[in-house]
Amino acid sequence: SNLPDIVQFQDHYIQRYVSDYPDAFVPMEGADVDWDGFGKEKLSYSIVDGVHYGVPVDNSTVIFAYRTDLLEQVGKTIDDMTGATWADVTKVGEDVYAKTGKYLFSCSGDNGDLIYIMMQAEGVAEFKDGEPYITENETMHRVCETIVDMAKKNVCYLANSWSDYIDQSIQGDMVAGVVQGNWIIPTMEAVTENSGKWQITTIPTLDGGEGYASNGGSSLYITANCGNVDLAKSFLAYTFGGSTQTYDNALRDGGVVTTVLKCADSDVYNEGIEFFNNEPVYKQIVEMSENVPIIEQSDYHVRAGVYLTTAVINTINGSNLDD
């Protein structure tokens, strides 16, 4: 085998690889890792049949970031947006667009990120018992209807591509908000003239209350090709297995955010971030990660998201969503 000792896998796909190639990966059982110290949703990706196979690397908890200066123009604050319904957010978005000409937020129209995020915030998946959960999924229907409504009312800008989403809508200063995994922060920070004008909060929900979701992320795994499994386990346990020092350095030097919950108490994570009005956003993100609900995953979730987004776009253009 040409596999390295340790590999990094995207969270959404690792369970299929471990299931299909069980002899290719070494369980992390016996490693000195405080598994209870991680956000449960993040950890769930690397557990197969009750066995730990990976060590989480990063944190992809979704944030909803708002330009507070633009909210103020329509008489709103970040507190008004926290725990709001999507209907409330839509009304604010209409006011923001009328007042400033900016969409409240955007999403990429060539993937299902927004649908997945909104669904997870409701604790519902696109799959059930290994099968697509679409036609009888009332929550999904409401989510898609909400996105159609927001797009028609110029609340949500549906970008034509990932480049359009990143380069035009966010870095082109078209939006008053960003809803995405927190890895989007460096993209936002590239617009330096808006430094200090942003704050983050949780995701709206259909019926109100703070919503939580995660989008993306990866973990580290030991392969059967490893020549010294005990050393590899010790290395992962010492570094990414719960060390606050490792994650303090990773955040300070590389912008890597953790789901190790105790890091929320570290000095580094409690530092105010100038771009976000000197709020300790990384502490907030770690605390949010503890509340992300675990939902059923599938290797086909990306493909399902594309199909669902296509249905949303077709509905915006005049088709019937139920079709």
Predicted regions and their residues:
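Extracytoplasmic/periplasmic solute-binding protein
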Residues: V51-V57, V62, E72, A87-Y133, ...
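Glycine-centered hinge/linker elements that transmit conformational signals in sensory
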Residues: T90-D95, E131-N160, E189, I203
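Short, solvent-exposed loop/beta-turn-alpha elements that line the ligand-binding surface or hinge
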Residues: P27-F38, M81-T82, V124-V143, A190-E193, ...
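C-terminal lobe and pocket-closing loops
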Residues: I184-N194, D207-T310
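Hinge/lid segment of periplasmic solute-binding proteins
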Residues: F9-I63, A87-V92, A98, I117, ...
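Paired acidic/hydrophobic, glycine-rich loop segments that form the ligand-binding mouth/hinge
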Residues: D5-Q8, A176-G181, Q199
